Amino acid sequence: MAELKNDRYLRALLKQPVDVTPVWMMRQAGRYLPEYKATRAQAGDFMSLCRNAELACEVTLQPLRRYDLDAAILFSDILTVPDAMGLGLYFETGEGPRFERPTDTLDAIKKLAVPDPEDELGYVMKAVSTIRRELKGEVPLIGFSGSPWTLATYMVEGGSSKTFEKIKKMAYAEPAALHMLLDKLADAVTLYLNAQVANGAQSLMIFDSWGGALSHTAYREFSLRYMQKIVDGLTRHADGRQVPVTLFTKGGGLWLEAMAETGCDALGLDWTVDIADARRRVGHKVALQGNMDPSMLYASPERIHEEVRQILAGYGEGSGHVFNLGHGIHQHVDPEHAGAFIKSVHELSAQYHK
């Protein structure tokens, strides 16, 4: 593997000194970029794009050609794991992801098998190794998965949900069934992420998109417990260096202390969290990633610049901050505004790393 030329993202996650605050964007390879739309059209549909290693590599690299980003993230989808478990993933126009065979009964859960990441998910591993090779050591590659709870919400509900009625009914009326599902998913995600590291991922991120829908105690029981299980089983060294792990629960600002106890290296913050407060609470244990409201990218470049200034000042001096949005970039954002955001982070952050 090529020697890593820019490792400030990995260094910041481990709270080692950096020259400027590293920056990348969730969904940086996505629909706001015209070149992404062209490649997706070439692929035919979203999952065909994910399953084609060369095209997945191409869209992963597209934002790096435009912007001075400090990391690349694998182009894939969190629902690849349940799809590999045989649920029949498809995308309904205007509806988002759906499953032909939801796992909403104990019987269905019992029948689920944990997929072999090198077999059923071999197309993801091929994409990881292709991207790592084509990056040529420019920046590190982030691998990722959804959290067990978040994957389970889609599997039990049969797709996206606003109320989470079916899975919450299972959580409170049939908790043993849900725990069986979450346990299988924790095993599947651990294998999946370790396979990504074996194929070239240099950092890992677990996206708990729907953990914030849970009550205080239910979050620990149904989400955090299974992320803890994954963290305990992850490969944390490869290529002679540490493989940092970031946990991100959207709406998880209440639980930062508990998340930091898992042994992860960093926590992702959404935009509802004050980063100065987060650093006071958990900055002695973990690095922090975030946390500009993605909608701020609709503002003028001058206003974006000011928002970046405020967030950097909120975190303050020293390493341990990876700048990002508080969630994925919106599809209608002007790519020039994303560029202004990235430039502002590098320009304004040097003073905090003297």
Curated annotation (Swiss-Prot):
Predominant subcellular localization, coarse grouping: cytoplasm
Residues bound to substrate: R27, Q28, A29, G30, R31, D77, Y154, S209, H327
Subcellular location: Cytoplasm
Site for Transition state stabilizer, residues: D77
Catalytic function, reaction form: uroporphyrinogen III + 4 H(+) = coproporphyrinogen III + 4 CO2
GO biological process, one term: protoporphyrinogen IX biosynthetic process from glutamate
GO-annotated cellular components: cytosol
The EC number(s) this enzyme carries: 4.1.1.37
Job of this protein: Catalyzes the decarboxylation of four acetate groups of uroporphyrinogen-III to yield coproporphyrinogen-III.
HAMAP family for this protein: URO_D
Protein name: Uroporphyrinogen decarboxylase
Gene that this polypeptide is encoded by: hemE
